[in-house]
Amino acid sequence: MTRTASLSRRQLLRGATVIAVGGASALLTACGESALTAEDGSTPSPSPAAPTSAPATAAAATQAPTPPTASPTPPTATRVDMLPRATVAPTTPAPTAAPTTPPATPAPSPTATPIQAADVVLADGAITLPGSVVARREPRLIAPESHHRGQIEIWRSGGWQTNFDLSVVSYGEILSGGVPRDGIPPIDAPTFVAAPEADAWLDDREPVVVFGANGETRAYPLQILTWHEIANDVVGGRPVAVTFCPLCNSALVFDREVLGATMRFGVSGNLRNSDLIMWDDLTETWWQQLTGEGIVGDLAGYFLDPLPSQLIGYGEFKASFPNGMVLGRDTGFRRDYGRNPYPGYDAARGSPFLFRGELDDRLRSGERVVAIEIGGEAVAYAFTHLQSVGVVNDVVGGLPVVVFWSPETASALDARAIADAKAVGSGVAFGREVAGRTLTFEPGDGAFTDRETGSTWSIAGEAVAGALEGIQLPPVVHANHFWFAWAAFYPETRLVK
């Protein structure tokens, strides 16, 4: 089987026949206790605040280049008892570079018809990369420089079958996080418990990632995700990857169905701009976690489908979703769940850990923001601003949105015990159009009110009282990032502070 590593970029784009590319080995089990548990069974405590010693859990935090610019479909309000699926997230992400159709080898006649970029079959036929995507990424591909060849050979000798001839980023931007592939093991067989059982070890202020699909809603505590960074799950029949990069405070959910195949995602052990770089088990493409773009490998230039989620306090999750389930501690790994392996990290000053980019001085690098990108427009809402106003009504990419503020959510990166951490708050975003009417929200005592009907809304975006009771605002894809991380990949972002 021929790998694309032996093919030039021009061959990939001009091939009149489908190109078959060998698939990567399916690594369906995580690397046990690698790098996180000592031989005697103890769990060392990494310390990101001390960059002289790479933390064992500084596994990767990766961000993807500019996300798709397709205009979202306006959300429609529905009566539901769970978080609805995304109605505003782009369903067919694509890079922002203008699509082109590369011509064939120079033709003798000016009337010759250019050869269209061929579809590319990957992973032993499991995935077909559309020719349109192949064509779009061509102008963005970056050939490895000679001084990067040595590092590429080290990766290959370590077992990587990634197609390193295809990259949309410079290899000089990729740094080792100090652990091998899946040295921070993802959770591949998650188990869930009801709230009464989770109450024994999960404080109401602790942050949880909330995701729902097809009648199921689940919470993923950061006290667990901090140690694993990825949970490969199936929610309501939908395969998803719930991801968290502690170094960037970025919690995002992605669809694991990619071009018709279901992928398992792992932690590459590498970072770019301090952000986690994930990998998939079918093509071994490397993916930027913060934006979901394939940056190295056969699927470089392709974007994962992001799904809307919320980062809120566990108590708020229970109040909004009384039947929701919680990711349990029975993960198959021995970890000191509840203990923060990055104590004091979010209070650190200066350049973030393993960050080599330029810092945007519009905010302190470690300040949190609610970040949204819709229709090519990126916006960040500073936590300090949200704390002072309680709610923000805005329009992003032509879509009316609202950002709700919750003040009590604890930091997962402050005190050694997350339950004892300071409150940093959290922000959630929704579309604010209901039945063709744009609502305007105001903060209240633990809830929110719209001016148009006087209905009361919860932090989860559900009307709990008033004329619109039972209506759920459609969520938008957003996250609570550290400012430096968001600004590194969206330098033109509009900042609301």
Please report, for each region that a protein language model flagged, where it lies by residue.
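N-terminal secretory signal peptides
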Residues: M1-Q11, G15-C31
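Short, intrinsically disordered low-complexity segments
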Residues: T2, S8-R9, L13, T78, ...
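Secondary-structure transition/capping residues
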Residues: G23-L27, L36-A38, G328, K497
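Residue-level detector of alpha-helical recognition elements and their boundaries
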Residues: L27-L28, T62, G260, G332
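Ser/Thr-rich, Proline-interspersed low-complexity disordered segments
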Residues: A35-E145
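Mid-to-C-terminal functional-domain signal that highlights helix-capping/loop sites
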Residues: P114-K497
